[in-house]
């Protein structure tokens, strides 16, 4: 299974912690992330799942087309520009820094896409 990872879909879970006063901008960017990546041919048609933690961190679950697509994103000027917008309004944090991650059945507030 691991041998095929370069060409198989890769599910990712990303935690975006908005900078103070940047909650709205962060949410707008998260909502636009997958559509932007889809235009570049880098993600699958899987609908992303978005949710909000108690501390305001936004969690997104989405699927890249492959490891190769992830690598290509790091060289794509449109993706790099989008990521720079993210860095201005939020920090990407490890999932284990989200308070709910220590709970057996972590619950989050759903966010409409």
Walk through the language-model features, giving the residues of each.
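Short, low-complexity N-terminal intrinsically disordered segments enriched in polar/charged residues
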Residues: 1-7, 28, 39, 113
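An amphipathic, aromatic/His-enriched active-site/gating alpha helix that lines ligand/cofactor pockets
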Residues: 5, 32-46, 63-100
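Acidic/histidine-enriched, glycine/proline-rich intrinsically disordered or flexible terminal extensions
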Residues: 5, 98-113
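Short coil/turn motifs at beta-sheet boundaries
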Residues: 5-9, 53-55
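Active-site-flanking beta-strand signature of metal-NTP-handling nucleotidyl enzymes
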Residues: 9-17, 59-61
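Short, surface-exposed ligand-recognition loops at beta-strand->loop->(often short) alpha-helix junctions
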Residues: 17-28
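Short acidic/glycine-enriched loop/turn segments that link adjacent beta-strands
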Residues: 44, 54-58
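A short beta-turn/loop motif at secondary-structure boundaries
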Residues: 49-55, 89
């Amino acid at each position: 299974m691991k041998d095929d990872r370069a060409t198989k879909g890769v599910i990712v879970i990303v935690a975006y912690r908005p900078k103070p006063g940047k909650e709205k901008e962060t949410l707008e960017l998260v909502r636009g992330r997958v559509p932007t990546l889809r235009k570049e041919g880098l993600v699958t048609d899987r609908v992303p799942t978005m949710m909000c933690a108690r501390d305001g961190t936004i969690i997104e679950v989405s699927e890249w087309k492959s490891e190769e697509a992830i690598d290509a994103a790091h060289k794509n000027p449109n993706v790099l520009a989008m990521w720079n917008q993210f860095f201005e309004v939020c920090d990407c944090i490890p999932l284990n820094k989200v308070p709910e991650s220590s709970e057996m059945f972590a619950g989050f507030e759903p966010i409409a896409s």
